Amino acid sequence: MRRELEGYPIGSPIPWPSVTPPPGYFLMAGQRFPCGSYPGLARVYPGCVLPDLRGTFIRGWDNGRGFDNGRTILSYQADQSDMIYNPGGHLQGHHSGMAHYYHTDTREVRPKNIAFNYIVKAG
């Protein structure tokens, strides 16, 4: 497995299907790392702190596209769920014209998923 990982650039998040990363890799859990010991990793993460990717997913940076204005690279964004409401309007077919809010006593909306660790090549 280690040979397959060699092609990843230093600093690239890699989904990892195990609790323990292989030698030479760190879990991406928000921890500091020694800049002097890992200069390649420090070039990618200049603050010498890895992002905490536990329980989160990676979203492509907007970079001026207009879907997620104001975000900076490596910034964190908390979850948000809005109530859907449509007071009416014209719809073709057999519809009531109302959007309905379905509540399941959860505090977030999330897609189906499988839990992996994210790891990063240390250097």
Go through the PLM ranges and name each one.
Residues M1-G123:
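Low-complexity Ser/Thr/Gly/Asn-rich repetitive segments
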